[in-house]
Amino acid sequence: MAASMQFYGVKTPELALNSKRIEFSSKGLNFSALVSSARVFSRNVDRSCKNIALRVTCEAGRVELLERKASETFKLNKTEKKLTCVMKFGGSSVASAERMIQVAKLILSFPDEKPVVVLSAMAKTTNKLLMAGEKAVCCGVTNVDTIEELSYIKELHIRTAHELGVETAVIAEHLEGLEQLLKGVAMMKELTLRSRDYLVSFGECMSTRLFAAYLNKIGHKARQYDAFEIGIITTDDFTNADILEATYPAVSKKLLGDWSKENALPVVTGFLGKGWRSCAVTTLGRGGSDLTATTIGKALGLREIQVWKDVDGVLTCDPNIYCGAQPVPHLTFDEAAELAYFGAQVLHPLSMRPAREGNIPVRVKNSYNPTAPGTVITRSRDMSKAVLTSIVLKRNVTMLDITSTRMLGQYGFLAKVFSTFEKLGISVDVVATSEVSISLTLDPSKFCSRELIQHELDQVVEELEKIAVVNLLRHRSIISLIGNVQRSSFILEKGFRVLRTNGINVQMISQGASKVNISLIVNDDEAEHCVKALHSAFFETDTCEAVSECPTGYIAASS
């Protein structure tokens, strides 16, 4: 035995030879000895082996032992190497070389974190790419290199590379590919939805390559990944694809596998995926980088998902509408999803689902003000004193009033109405019904980028007029009151008093099944004034104290 173990550089311990004979074997190592017990032998081997790990198999009992000199240090190193969180940065956070340098400093200021970094395209790049595509349709192949937006994109990214001190070679292939794609669009004289998705993907592909190259330059090992190459698998709904369940195991296998081999910080493109049938590049809709971040967080089972924006977290209303907007310290996933869906630009509407399913907290922070506490989004929070969390405005909404006496005592009427929308591919936002009528709003984000909008609306009216009287109302806005709807009586009483005082007429009201949202429909030209008045009433007075002073029966009646 001693000879066998010494062959591997192990100083053998003294063994007691007064017990039964046990046969031991390991890969490349065979020996037998008389020992008092496997446990005593293992301790002795541990002291002798130092940093050498031995896997010892006892044929009598099949006991496997893995011994190391410093087990605590080993455990610590294992913890340090584990990916801990996702850090997602939007376009304004990486808008220039200066901003990228600040983001790198921010990431490295958390030495205990081993993040997956998700980046959007540099600010304005996506819009410039789309404008370049539209111009390429009619400019002719020979004039593509004169497109102003193409020149802007080239100059921005080359300048950024120089200012970061990295080689322009990291983006040269993509700049060349972008120009060739635009020439193809010019030759075909059309920009399909599939081509549009491929076109805008160049923004994220270049920003992540520049950022990863900079991290490597300053001595922090990083590796760039295109989301469509690491397993983000989507439907083939170009410009607004949905992520499929097959994504999670694929992403986990790729990122964790690479991380275990090289410990390079992953820098991943947001917003992008790969169609499961077409294998073409798809996009997740505007703001889709948030969804990329939460999807990766769930796939890897990380501790936290951080979404870094240019505002101090989720606010009580849009600061562009009212400068008195305040940060919201805590939200539930349900509240955040409603906020995003009804117009809050700080989060993608679908981004909360993976986080909720994985029960992973989402923290919204300001990359321009990293010391601000931001907003923490979790499954639940203390709602005992909560009244209103935020006020959200969605403009340019179309409203339909559908009236028919056929609804009385009949079944299947609503099914006929909604099958019409399904057939035409139009999404419904808010619904309210009575005995003989339905009022609903149409989601502008689902069809505002498509041509023939009026034609589609005319089709809706034509189909519905076969079964009802239809009134189409344009230029409406949805004002959503997100909060504790168990306080709905108080919220509505106070809200309608404010609106009546300001002469604003509510044309429709709906309380969502989510129990965190009350939606009001008003005219577009009254919407901003409405938000300001409601914000002043709910957030600039002691609303919580007023609620606590209400009679118990009054509160109970609202639940």
Curated annotation (Swiss-Prot):
Task: Supply the EC number(s).
Answer: 2.7.2.4
The family database entries (PROSITE patterns) matched by this protein are listed as: ACT, ASPARTOKINASE
Q: Which InterPro entries does the entry link to? A: AceGlu_kinase-like_sf, ACT-like_dom_sf, ACT_Aspartokinase, ACT_dom, Asp/Glu/Uridylate_kinase, Asp_kinase, AsparK_Bifunc_asparK/hSer_DH, Aspartate_kinase_CS
Residues annotated as transit peptide in the record = 1-85
Q: Does the keyword Aminoacyl-tRNA synthetase apply?
A: no
Subcellular location per UniProt equals:
Plastid, Chloroplast
Protein name per its UniProtKB record: Aspartokinase 3, chloroplastic
- Gene from which the chain derives: AK3
